């Protein structure tokens, strides 16, 4: 019998007895024992703050080129700062593309740096020294504070964890399970060296519902001050690889930690600024992503349900004020990327049919029928049956007076199911994630942006008579200004 099994043999017997009704309090007591041993080994007990740096690759979760398929690979560097005492986290992240196809906000060439942070129930980014409130990130960032070797020990001790045992190959692992209410569920697998080998968690996703995240830790080293930390980290999200990192530096209990919630982020609320583009057509702006409301004879069409419940609910509320008495019957989705589809469940809860390219239908059918138990959202609470309509490369919806068209952007680099929305009567084009006009006084670049080339080629191929562009990101502008950016 190895040392670990000698130490936990009594615990294993106790765990076996749970089958016959061992009280939950006994399971919690035994879990506390294995957690305290891991805490002593890893230096978690007196660890208040942690800074670590790592580099490797990331894959853009929720940003595939094809719905449900491979995620876009990135080159990735991170310095993560965690404040366990104040439940705060700040990531200084630098990303660049390792391949051109797929989503994410990184440019086709060069790097992008930003800070991604959360403190309590407030999240924000810092881009070029500017604060960008982002409460949609709270649900994904709060778990990051605790779903790491030291954090999971602290969270498990606080949340009355229970203990079971599994054998994997020739290894015996203690499995500590607990729930952080409304945030995540977790299982921490602890080996005979009292190290956290992996954490299996379920976190809430606006698109996927209960989303599994598995993080593996290996090659622990002593980084000083009695703190051990893994040298390698691998993470998968919803069954797809999302991180492979090598840790280069760890600073336990550093005096450099001061994560302060900016006032602009603390006071942020989702608001919608509506503007009339034509009779019965409104731009719904006020955030990072726009939506559009289109009035039909006896119903309303909404273009784009982005981000998460709170944003899309604000859009719904504003739409009802602008177009009273006409239900939102259709929600047109430009593509599957999480930031553009995070509110489709909210619209489905409203009773709208989700309209998307046929290549996305199976993906949305699975996603929107998944359980949503960790943090029940509007869709879960509504208990509505979701209707997803997959359409071909061209789709026309009309009431006899106004027509709304959807067109596939063929050969798009961003996503192969990317749709544009066109209103022929108004000569208005709605597009997502394509470039806009050049800054005032700027000259067209010698090498055109491939996104821009493909965008204009598609408009020309379809022979769309476009006067005005209403982008999902940014302000409306003349299409002539887009063509000027290409030198036309």
What are these regions (language model features)?
Residues 27-36, 107-186, 192, 203-210, ...:
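Flexible, processing/modification-adjacent segments and terminal tails
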Residues 170-261, 419-424, 431-432, 437-438, ...:
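Gly/Pro-enriched, hydrophobic low-complexity segments
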Residues 37-40, 44-131, 159-167, 309:
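N-terminal mature ectodomain segment of secretory-pathway/periplasmic proteins
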Residues 456-488:
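Divalent-metal (often Zn2+) His-rich catalytic cores of metallo-beta-lactamase-fold enzymes
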Residues 242-297:
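Zn-dependent metallo-beta-lactamase
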Residues 10-21:
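Bacterial N-terminal signal peptides
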Residues 275-319, 418-437:
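Conserved beta-strand hairpin/beta-sheet module of binuclear metal-dependent hydrolase folds
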Residues 310-355, 461-467:
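Active-site metal-binding motif and surrounding structural segment of the metallo-beta-lactamase
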């Amino acid at each position: 019998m190895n040392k670990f099994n000698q130490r936990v043999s009594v615990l294993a017997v106790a765990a076996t007895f749970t089958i016959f009704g061992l009280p939950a309090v006994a399971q919690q007591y035994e879990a506390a024992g294995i957690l305290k041993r891991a805490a002593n080994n890893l230096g978690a007990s007196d660890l208040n703050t942690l800074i670590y740096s790592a580099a490797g690759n990331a894959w853009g979760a929720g940003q595939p080129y094809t719905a449900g398929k491979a995620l876009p690979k990135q080159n990735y560097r991170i310095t993560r700062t965690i404040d366990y005492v104040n439940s705060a986290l700040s990531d200084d992240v630098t990303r660049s593309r390792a391949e051109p196809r797929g989503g994410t906000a990184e440019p086709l060439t060069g790097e992008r740096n930003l800070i991604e942070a959360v403190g309590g129930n407030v999240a924000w980014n810092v881009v070029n020294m500017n604060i960008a409130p982002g409460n949609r990130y709270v649900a994904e960032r709060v778990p990051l504070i605790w779903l790491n070797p030291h954090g999971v020990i602290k969270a498990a001790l606080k949340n009355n964890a229970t203990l079971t045992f599994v054998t994997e190959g020739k290894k015996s692992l203690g499995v500590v399970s607990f729930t952080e209410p409304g945030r995540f569920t977790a299982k921490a697998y602890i080996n005979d060296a009292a190290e956290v080998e992996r954490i299996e968690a379920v976190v809430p996703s606006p698109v996927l519902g209960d989303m599994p995240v598995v993080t593996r830790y290996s090659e622990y080293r002593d980084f000083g001050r009695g703190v051990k930390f893994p040298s390698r980290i691998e993470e998968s999200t919803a069954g797809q690889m999302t991180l492979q990192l090598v840790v280069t530096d760890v600073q336990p209990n550093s005096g450099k930690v001061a994560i302060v919630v900016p006032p602009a982020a603390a006071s942020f609320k989702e608001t919608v600024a509506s503007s009339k583009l034509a009779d019965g057509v409104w731009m719904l702006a006020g955030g990072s992503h726009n939506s559009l409301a289109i009035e039909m004879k006896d119903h309303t069409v909404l273009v784009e349900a982005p981000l998460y419940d709170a944003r899309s609910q604000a859009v719904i509320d504003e739409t009802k004020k602008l177009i009273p008495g006409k239900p939102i019957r259709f929600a047109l989705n430009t593509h599957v990327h999480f930031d553009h589809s995070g509110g489709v469940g909210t619209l489905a809860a409203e009773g709208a049919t989700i309209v998307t390219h046929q290549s996305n239908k199976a993906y949305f059918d699975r996603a929107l029928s998944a359980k949503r138990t960790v943090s029940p959202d509007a869709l879960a609470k509504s208990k509505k049956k979701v209707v997803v309509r997959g359409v071909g490369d061209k789709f026309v919806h009309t009431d006899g007076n106004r027509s709304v068209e959807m067109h596939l952007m063929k050969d798009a680099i961003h996503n192969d199911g990317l749709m544009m929305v066109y209103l022929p009567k108004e000569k208005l084009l709605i597009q997502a994630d394509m470039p806009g006009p050049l800054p005032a006084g700027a000259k067209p670049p010698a090498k055109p942006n491939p996104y821009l080339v493909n965008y204009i080629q598609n408009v020309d191929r379809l022979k769309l008579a476009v006067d005005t562009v209403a982008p999902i990101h940014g302000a409306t502008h003349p299409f002539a200004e887009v063509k000027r950016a290409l030198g036309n």
